[in-house]
Every structure is written in C-alpha cells, then in structure tokens.
Amino acid sequence: MSAEPLIAGVDEVGRGALFGPVVAAVVVTVPSGFARLWELGVKDSKQLSPQKRQKLSRQIQRDFVCRIGYATVKEIDRLNIFHASLLAMSRAIGKLPLSPSLCWVDGKHIIKDLSIPQKAVIQGDQQSPVIAAASIVAKVWRDDLITRWHRRYPDYGLARHKGYGTAQHLEAIGNYGLTSQHRLSFSPCQPRLEHDCRTICPRVIEIS
C-alpha cells in the first residue's frame, strides 16, 4: 500500500446557471498521481472543448476515485447559491469510500463541518490538477443532466446553453414561463415570476 497521503480535489459547476442543480465532483489521488493528470491534459474545464471534456472525464473516472454530489433547485432557492454549492461539495466528499488526508477546495472558502483537513485554493481549477480533474467530471455530469432535461423542455434551448442566462434562454423564459427546474431566487427569473403571480395569484383586497 502506498505511503503517500491521499489528496482530494473538489470543485462545483453551475453556480451561475438559471436552471438545474449545482453539481460538485471530488477526485482523489496521491501526489505522484498529479503527473498522470497533467499527462492526460487536465486543465480548467472551461478551457476544454465538450469532446475533450467527455474523453477526459471517462479517463479520470477510470483511473482515479471520483464521486458526484449536487444540491437541488429547491435547496438553491432556500439556502442561496453559495451555501448550496458548499452542500454539493460536502455531499460529493461524503460519498467517498476512503478518507483523504487533505481536501483542496476550489475558491476562497472551506466546507463547514467537514471532518477532514481542508485548504481553500483560489482559482484552484487552474492551479491544481486534482481540482481541475474534479471540475471536468462535474461539468460533464451536469451537462449530460441538463441535456436530458432538454428533452422534457425542448423550447428553452437547454442543450445549447446548459441552463445559463443566454439571450435565447431569457427569451424562452419570457415566452414560455418558468419550469420546475428554474431557480426562482435568481434575478433574471424574477420578472417572469412576478408576472405569473400577477396573472395566476388572486389579489388580496383589504376592505376597511
């Protein structure tokens, strides 16, 4: 058995989207495994083509311990996106079949009530191969999920923008309304929510 410490990297995707859950992935390796990740071509998922991300995600999940966690739209609206993102990360780590010696968390904040040592790494998906690997796995998993939702809501163009607030998406919200997977607490969804409430919800008239 290797005497090297187990290092986990965790990252989330979908924080800025208007539709769907926020998704986190954790990837675990030993320090000598970093070279393998660099060799595969791991980098920040936003810098990779969808085809390259798909290929890398399969390779990462084949060669390393990985887990996924997410927070639902209802949890995002109830907790706010910051706390929901940390919840998704915590859930991913909680599914691990082993206990890492250290967890590197992308961003400025560590995860509350996590029993293992943590280090927050600003722009971690650009600094750490294990965090970058987690960003790739999370991105591919979430994109696949949103593409499946596209089959249920084809008018919103979800397969193209993956739930983010593009002009096409905002126009579709204006035309067709909000779905069960839209984040009602996000400001771009508010005008349509207020419109629907005025249209559907009866006004309460106070009689003096």
Curated annotation (Swiss-Prot):
Molecular function in Gene Ontology: manganese ion binding; RNA binding; RNA-DNA hybrid ribonuclease activity
Gene Ontology biological process: DNA replication, removal of RNA primer; mismatch repair
Cofactor, how bound (note): Manganese or magnesium. Binds 1 divalent metal ion per monomer in the absence of substrate. May bind a second metal ion after substrate binding.
EC number: 3.1.26.4
Pfam families attached to this UniProt entry: RNase_HII (PF01351)
Keyword annotations from UniProtKB, A to Z: Cytoplasm, Endonuclease, Hydrolase, Manganese, Metal-binding, Nuclease
Coarse class of the protein's main subcellular location: cytoplasm
Required cofactor(s): Mn(2+); Mg(2+)
The organism's place on the tree of life at top rank: Bacteria
Residues where a divalent metal cation binds: D11, E12, D106
Compartments it resides in: Cytoplasm
SUPFAM superfamilies associated with the record: Ribonuclease H-like
Reactions mediated catalytically: Endonucleolytic cleavage to 5'-phosphomonoester
Cross-referenced HAMAP family: RNase_HII_B
Sequence similarity: Belongs to the RNase HII family.
Name this polypeptide is given: Ribonuclease HII
Organism: Microcystis aeruginosa (strain NIES-843 / IAM M-2473)
